[in-house]
C-alpha cells in the first residue's frame, strides 16, 4: 500500500511490483481488481518490471465515502502513481474500465511520462457498439439502482459476471467470490457497485474526445480481443478492422469478455511479443 496525492486528497492505493526489465503497467477492469492479472504476472515478470494496482474504489485501495468516482480522477491517480514510482516510459496493458482510463491518458498526451506501447483488451472502444448488461443498465436508474445495489449479494455478483465469459472458459466461482469480497472490503456502504458504474454514462458523454484520441494517437496500439464477448466483442473487432485495415488485432475465437482470465497463457505470450525487447 502506498500513499498518493490525487486531486489534493491523500489516497491509500494498493500496488504490487514484481520482476525486472522494462516497466509494464497493468490496469484492471470493472468490477474486479488487480488480482485479475494474477495468472499472467509470473510470466510477464520474467521480462518486465510489472506494476499492478487497484483503482480508487476497487480491491484493496481506499474506498472514500460518498465519492463521485470518475475515469478522469483515475487517470490522475495513474499519473501520481507513475511519478511516485519514478517510471517514465511504461508499456500499458489495460482491460475494460482500465482501457477507458488508458485512453484518457493517451488523450492527455502527458509530458511527465511516455507510453511506449498500449495493449488494450476488450472494452467499449466504440461507445455506440458497447452493450452493457441489463443489470448494469438498471443499476444506473435512479431509485431502482440503489435498491439493486443493496440487493447485490455474492451469488448474484457471480452469476452476473459469469454471463460475459465464454462457454469454453467459464468463470471460476471461487475466483469471482474473491473479487466480490475485495469490492466489499472497506466500502463505506453497500452501493459501491452502483457508484463505480458511473463510468458508463461518463464514457458516453466523452465519446468524441476518447475515440478521437485512439484514432489520432502516435502511441503504438495493439488489441487482444475475446470474440465471444456479449458486451464488447466481435462487433467492435469488426469495426476496428474496418477503420484500421493494418491494425494489430489478435482475436481469441473461444474467449469472452475476459480473455486474460479465460486464456491467460495465450494472452501473456501475446503481450510479451509486443512489449518485451527481443532476446539476442
Predicted regions and their residues:
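Alpha/beta-hydrolase fold catalytic core
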Residues: 1-24, 45-48, 87-89, 245-248, ...
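Active-site loop/oxyanion-hole signature of alpha/beta-hydrolase fold enzymes
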Residues: 6-9, 16-18, 52-94, 125, ...
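Conserved HGGG/HGGXW glycine-rich cap/lid loop of the alpha/beta-hydrolase fold
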Residues: 16-60
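Conserved catalytic-core motifs of eukaryotic protein kinase domains, centered on the activation segment
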Residues: 36-38, 61-67, 130-131, 234-235
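Conserved hydrolase catalytic core segment
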Residues: 88-130
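Helix-rich cap/lid subdomain of alpha/beta-hydrolase
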Residues: 130-184, 190-191
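Catalytic histidine-centered segment of alpha/beta-hydrolase-like enzymes
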Residues: 255-264
Amino acid at each position: 500500500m502506498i500513499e498518493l496525492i490525487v486531486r489534493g486528497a491523500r489516497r491509500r492505493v494498493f500496488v504490487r511490483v514484481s520482476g525486472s526489465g522494462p516497466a509494464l503497467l497493468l490496469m484492471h477492469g470493472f468490477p474486479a481488481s488487480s488480482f485479475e492479472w494474477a495468472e499472467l504476472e509470473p510470466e510477464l515478470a520474467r521480462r518486465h518490471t510489472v506494476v499492478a494496482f487497484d483503482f480508487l474504489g476497487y480491491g484493496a485501495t481506499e474506498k472514500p465515502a460518498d465519492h463521485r468516482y470518475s475515469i478522469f480522477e483515475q487517470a490522475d491517480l495513474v499519473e501520481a502513481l507513475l511519478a511516485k514510482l519514478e517510471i517514465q516510459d511504461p508499456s500499458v496493458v489495460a482491460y475494460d474500465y482500465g482501457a477507458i482510463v488508458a485512453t484518457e491518458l493517451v488523450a492527455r498526451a502527458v509530458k511527465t511520462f511516455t507510453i511506449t506501447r498500449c495493449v488494450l483488451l476488450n472494452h467499449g472502444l466504440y461507445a455506440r457498439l458497447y452493450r452493457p448488461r441489463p443489470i448494469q443498465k438498471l443499476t444506473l436508474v435512479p431509485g431502482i439502482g440503489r435498491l439493486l445495489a443493496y440487493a447485490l449479494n455474492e451469488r448474484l455478483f457471480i452469476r452476473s459476471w459469469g454471463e460475459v465469459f465464454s462457454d469454453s472458459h467459464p468463470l471460476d466461482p471461487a475466483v469471482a467470490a474473491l473479487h466480490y469480497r475485495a469490492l466489499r472490503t472497506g466500502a463505506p456502504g453497500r452501493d459501491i457497485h452502483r457508484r463505480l458504474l458511473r463510468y458508463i454514462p461518463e464514457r458516453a458523454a466523452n465519446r468524441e474526445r476518447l475515440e478521437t484520441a485512439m484514432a489520432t494517437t502516435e502511441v503504438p496500439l495493439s488489441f487482444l480481443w475475446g470474440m465471444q464477448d456479449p458486451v464488447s466483442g466481435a462487433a467492435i473487432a469488426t469495426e476496428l478492422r474496418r477503420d484500421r485495415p493494418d491494425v494489430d488485432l489478435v482475436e481469441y475465437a473461444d474467449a469472452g469478455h475476459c480473455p486474460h482470465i479465460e486464456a491467460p497463457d495465450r494472452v501473456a505470450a501475446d503481450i510479451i511479443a509486443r512489449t518485451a525487447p527481443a532476446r539476442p
